[in-house]
C-alpha cells in the first residue's frame, strides 16, 4: 500500500489534484491492459495486471466502514 500511496502523492502533485492510492491501482491495471493489447503473449503484463487489481482489493479490505454509533437506550449502570 505504501508504494501506491507514494505514487498517488507524486501523481497528485503533477496533476494538481487529489489522487487516491486506489486510483493508482486502477490506472496501473489499465496500463497493463494497454500493454496486453500491444503484446498479448507477454505473460508479465497479465500477471502484473492481476497484481495491481489485488493491491486495489487490499486497499478496500483494509478500510472497513465504521460501525454506526449505538444510541444509548437508558437504564441503570
Question: Predicted segment positions?
Answer:
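Intrinsically disordered, low-complexity regulatory regions
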Residues: 1-77
Amino acid at each position: 500500500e505504501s508504494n501506491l500511496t507514494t505514487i498517488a502523492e507524486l501523481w497528485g502533485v503533477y496533476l494538481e489534484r487529489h489522487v487516491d492510492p486506489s486510483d493508482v491501482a486502477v490506472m496501473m491495471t489499465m496500463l497493463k491492459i494497454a500493454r496486453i493489447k500491444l503484446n498479448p503473449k507477454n505473460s508479465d503484463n497479465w500477471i502484473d495486471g492481476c497484481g495491481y487489481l489485488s493491491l486495489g482489493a487490499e486497499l478496500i479490505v483494509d478500510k472497513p466502514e465504521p460501525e454506526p454509533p449505538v444510541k444509548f437506550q437508558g437504564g441503570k449502570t
